[in-house]
Amino acid sequence: MRRELLLEKIEEYKAIMPWFVLDYYQSKLSVPYSFTTLYEYLKEYKRFFDWLIDSGISDAPRIADIKLDVLEHLTKKDMESFILYLRERPSLNTYSTKSGVSQTTINRTLSALSSLYKYLTEEVENDQGEPYFYRNVMKKVATKKKKETLASRAENIKQKLFLGDETMEFLDYVDCEYENKLSNRAKSSFQKNKERDLAIIALLLASGVRLSEAVNLDLKDVNLKMMVIEVTRKGGKRDSVNVASFAKPYLEHYLEIRQKRYKADKQDQAFFLTEYRGVPNRIDASSIEKMVGKYSQDFKIRVTPHKLRHTLATRLYDATKSQVLVSHQLGHASTQVTDLYTHIVNDEQKNALDKL
């Protein structure tokens, strides 16, 4: 979603929220939470508050009028009823064949509510220097995590990675073969954005940056001489990220056509642009997701930009066997997150088994 549209959506949600959620929002801006995270949390709060009113737990006529003491006095049984509502709600939708929302969605909802409750019961201060209330019902609510070993998760992910020669084969496919299947009209659209699309894919495969980090790149953040980019990580921290040299020609070719192709002026500082009716704009995350999905599906298997991040991490670990180096490249504070890649690159284990 474009930053401008994202901020508009956030304002729409803020306009209907109770005062204590607005307090929470303002506090988390100072952390800072990303606008994307806050937007997702506000969506979850609306869903929760709608349920409070519909279920009769709150007699407020609208979300903005929900009182703080409603949250204070919610019971564990109330929260379990809400979780059950989430599981059953899609079955009420005649257009859905699913029996309930995924556990991942439920966990995301509960995570958003836990953050709000922690703020209200621990972090905020009233006039007396005390939190608004002390009873945190979310501490009594258990989340159910998907049961899957790292080895199982690694095997599932491995099928969606472009490892070894496939990294360059994917880029070559988009560069030289993809358009051969297109109609003249589709080919014209592809050729307009070809250099940009290749540059985006190459950057993701060569750096492992998150989708949001690529979207928010500005011209000043990219140093092609040193092959280093400056990104804003989760939590608002700035970080320097090395980029593999194979991405350089793709980035250079894009920069050669960027200004003329996308009608960019000096004030258009976004690195990756779109152009509509002569007006350049920063490309949004959904456009990149669709683009990566389209090309990858035609090449081998439909993947997300995050799988390209996994591809870089796996290739880097395979080359270095260093979880520390991989965690630094990805912007993780701990090597625990990179344990997954040791299971994807498990040739030594398989070779040992073959010798038995």
From Swiss-Prot:
Major subcellular site: cytoplasm
Inhibition and activation profile: FtsK is required for recombination.
Annotated Tyr recombinase domain residues: 169-354
Keywords noted in UniProt: Cell cycle, Cell division, Chromosome partition, Cytoplasm, DNA integration, DNA recombination, DNA-binding
Origin superkingdom: Bacteria
Residues at the active site: R210, K234, H306, R309, H332, Y341
GO cellular component, one term: cytoplasm
Span of the signal peptide: none
Domain (Core-binding (CB)) ranges: 16-121
Primary role: Site-specific tyrosine recombinase, which acts by catalyzing the cutting and rejoining of the recombining DNA molecules. Essential to convert dimers of the bacterial chromosome into monomers to permit their segregation at cell division.
Sequence similarity: Belongs to the 'phage' integrase family. XerS subfamily.
Record protein name field: Tyrosine recombinase XerS
Species whose genome carries this gene: Streptococcus uberis (strain ATCC BAA-854 / 0140J)
Record lineage: Bacteria, Bacillati, Bacillota, Bacilli, Lactobacillales
Gene symbol of the encoding locus: xerS
